[in-house]
Amino acid sequence: MKIIFPILSNPVFRRTVKLLLCLLWIGYSQGTTHVLRFGGIFEYVESGPMGAEELAFRFAVNTINRNRTLLPNTTLTYDTQKINLYDSFEASKKACDQLSLGVAAIFGPSHSSSANAVQSICNALGVPHIQTRWKHQVSDNKDSFYVSLYPDFSSLSRAILDLVQFFKWKTVTVVYDDSTGLIRLQELIKAPSRYNLRLKIRQLPADTKDAKPLLKEMKRGKEFHVIFDCSHEMAAGILKQALAMGMMTEYYHYIFTTLDLFALDVEPYRYSGVNMTGFRILNTENTQVSSIIEKWSMERLQAPPKPDSGLLDGFMTTDAALMYDAVHVVSVAVQQFPQMTVSSLQCNRHKPWRFGTRFMSLIKEAHWEGLTGRITFNKTNGLRTDFDLDVISLKEEGLEKIGTWDPASGLNMTESQKGKPANITDSLSNRSLIVTTILEEPYVLFKKSDKPLYGNDRFEGYCIDLLRELSTILGFTYEIRLVEDGKYGAQDDANGQWNGMVRELIDHKADLAVAPLAITYVREKVIDFSKPFMTLGISILYRKPNGTNPGVFSFLNPLSPDIWMYVLLACLGVSCVLFVIARFSPYEWYNPHPCNPDSDVVENNFTLLNSFWFGVGALMRQGSELMPKALSTRIVGGIWWFFTLIIISSYTANLAAFLTVERMESPIDSADDLAKQTKIEYGAVEDGATMTFFKKSKISTYDKMWAFMSSRRQSVLVKSNEEGIQRVLTSDYAFLMESTTIEFVTQRNCNLTQIGGLIDSKGYGVGTPMGSPYRDKITIAILQLQEEGKLHMMKEKWWRGNGCPEEESKEASALGVQNIGGIFIVLAAGLVLSVFVAVGEFLYKSKKNAQLEKRSFCSAMVEELRMSLKCQRRLKHKPQAPVIVKTEEVINMHTFNDRRLPGKETMA
């Protein structure tokens, strides 16, 4: 008998039952906690504590389970396995064991050999493999089930290269731990072909932690810029050994590629002055990150690091932070794939996990802001190529952030001092520096004292005062040492070695060189200089020439011989022009008998001799009885008077100086004069900046001078300025030296003088070893002294001296025979000439009288002589037969003295 319940066949009832069953299942599902297992494989050392990565793995799982924010309905469990270092077989076995239990992902191991073994198994079975350390990826990488949270080293290598370029390093030493270091730093190793960079590569010893032999070799090779690619344990050991080797000074700059530099104990090196730079990926400035790290520290203290690890207690290492972030990134993918279930997998069956591909894709697409910043992956190779790095540097306060780097923007240096104002004494305060110098008056000299002096008190001078001012501003103490070989510093052409103060700076035997050390191109290549504290140039020191008297004919000196000749020619030319114009101008003829207005005879005073006499009279400022009447002749006379006014005024103005000033005639006036002769020897300080200037100069004159000096090297090059000055005083020798020293010497020795101007222009600067952090501080202090006027005051103090005695001033210099004796000679010559002319005139007149009176020449001459000696009135000699000239003939006459007026028939 079949019993039928009509209600069961009701469609409405059936839909209601299905809905209730669905709701019950959903409620059951939401109330049920899903359990998911992660696997972790970690290396360990026998009898060692739990590793930081394993501890971080457990810490991350426990944190997620406690918070229930990321996975509210999933409980994470873990299975951790420990293996020996580099044991790939054991790593494979442990991985298979975990896969048989059923794990959603395997974390670790760290070292490449073990990681590769686990990776191959994960690829075969489709289980994600999560790495937190760098692993070399080949170009045809087929590890599709692999992601790494460690920053991609091709990007990290670019960050290191950017840092090298920022510091403007020209030489770099790369020290790596194992062969993979060369792969990690491939961008840097390629740099020399693209940048002006010299690269030296060294490897740390593989079988021992003793790096002292390598460090000793680097110290001997003066390798100050070093990049260490090694673990933080090795980095801690290297720092300790470098400190013992004296390589933790301000001249060394180390860059560490390890991201755990911030966790090292750097307390012993804070005040050493060493430059230490590195990167940090842990975002410690984030408050949430700091809170997590603080919780981590409490658990870490339960399993402190090994004593020889070099890490500070409680610090979270980068590996631990990456492991913490790795667990959270995988958990994000779990959150997005709630229907995922884990099944047991067997390594020998090669049956992949059915959810593996989808789950791996979700992991690569995951985004997470973790302890190490933003986390994203390259979907192709699973590498972390987008990340942010903090650039950290060692300061006296500890390791501080000085910049950031990211693949997109590159390096951004901020030098943040946490709001502290910049202080130029930061790197020099309370430091004790070795200062090398050289004895050179007035820069550095021994202090004169009745009591014995010791240490820095033995010295005084301009450079000592400068050093004292720098010490006051920058707050350092110093010890002054004289350079051992007594040289400034020059390079030997044979072996390229330097000497003097430059060598001591190169060898780091001194921290500063405060001396008259010139800034030159060749020196700047091996040491650093501050801005110049004194500007100068090369000049010539020579004896003052002996004074020469003006000479008896010195009255001719105001005008050059050419001008005297031109004046004479001008006088002759003007006389001739005046004569011609006076003859042709009708207004220059006049009636010699004004009482007889009807006279037809006219005369012209400007004969050739009278014209010349007019010009000479005007030139001598005496005038004459001749005066031009016509406008044309007056124009000639006026222009000539103006000309003579200027000439005589100029002559008079210069005459006093030429008669009273004692002339100094030097055989040389410039470097060209020195180069053109060989009689006067010349030289400079051996191995000094002046010698180097002539040695390197390409200018023909200076090259010729260097050829002369090098050919007589033993005789013309001196050891010091004092020796050169003494040679100038005692022999025919010109000394090439700095103009400031010449200024000092000439103010104290009146027998010496500077010849010519400056041959070049340069400056004195404070020398420091190459790359010294003190240079910029000293430059700022020097500029401060310059603005305050203290540099000028110090120069006045040491250069002023007593000076040469000034000559007594005279209102009017007494002129002696040696000054104006020539005037008397000219006077005597004029008198003698006038006597001879008078005799000639006497003879000429006697001959004329004899012809007129038709008598002998001797009788006429005797009569003229008798009448001249008696000083009686002379009678005019009359001719015997007067000559009558007709009017027509007179009119046509062109004589030089008179002419007839036109229209007259007879002459009275």
UniProtKB/Swiss-Prot annotation:
Chain residue numbers at which the record places covalent cross-link Glycyl lysine isopeptide (Lys-Gly) (interchain with G-Cter in SUMO1): 886
GO MF, one example: glutamate-gated calcium ion channel activity
Gene Ontology CC terms, in alphabetical order: axon; dendritic spine; plasma membrane; postsynaptic membrane
Phosphoserine: modified positions: 846, 868
Keyword presence, tRNA-binding: no
Listed Pfam families: ANF_receptor, Lig_chan, Lig_chan-Glu_bd
First and last residue of the signal peptide: 1-31
Keywords: Cell membrane, Disulfide bond, Glycoprotein, Ion channel, Ion transport, Isopeptide bond, Ligand-gated ion channel, Membrane, Phosphoprotein, Postsynaptic cell membrane, Receptor, Signal, Synapse, Transmembrane, Transmembrane helix, Transport, Ubl conjugation
Topology term for the membrane: Multi-pass membrane protein
Localization in the cell: Cell membrane; Postsynaptic cell membrane
Stretches in topological domain Extracellular: 32-561, 660-819
Activity regulation info: Cold receptor activity activated by temperatures between 10-19 degrees Celsius.
Residue ranges annotated as Cytoplasmic topological domain: 583-638, 841-908
Primary residence: membrane
Catalytic reaction(s) noted: Ca(2+)(in) = Ca(2+)(out); Na(+)(in) = Na(+)(out)
Assembly information from the UniProt record: Homotetramer and heterotetramer with GRIK5. Tetramers may be formed by the dimerization of dimers. Assembles into a kainate-gated homomeric channel that does not bind AMPA. Can form functional heteromeric receptors with GRIK3, GRIK4 and GRIK5. Interacts with NETO2. Interacts with DLG4. Interacts with NETO2. Interacts (via C-terminus) with KLHL17 (via kelch repeats); the interaction targets GRIK2 for degradation via ubiquitin-proteasome pathway.
Family: Belongs to the glutamate-gated ion channel (TC 1.A.10.1) family. GRIK2 subfamily.
Protein name according to UniProt: Glutamate receptor ionotropic, kainate 2
Source organism of this protein record: Macaca fascicularis (Crab-eating macaque)
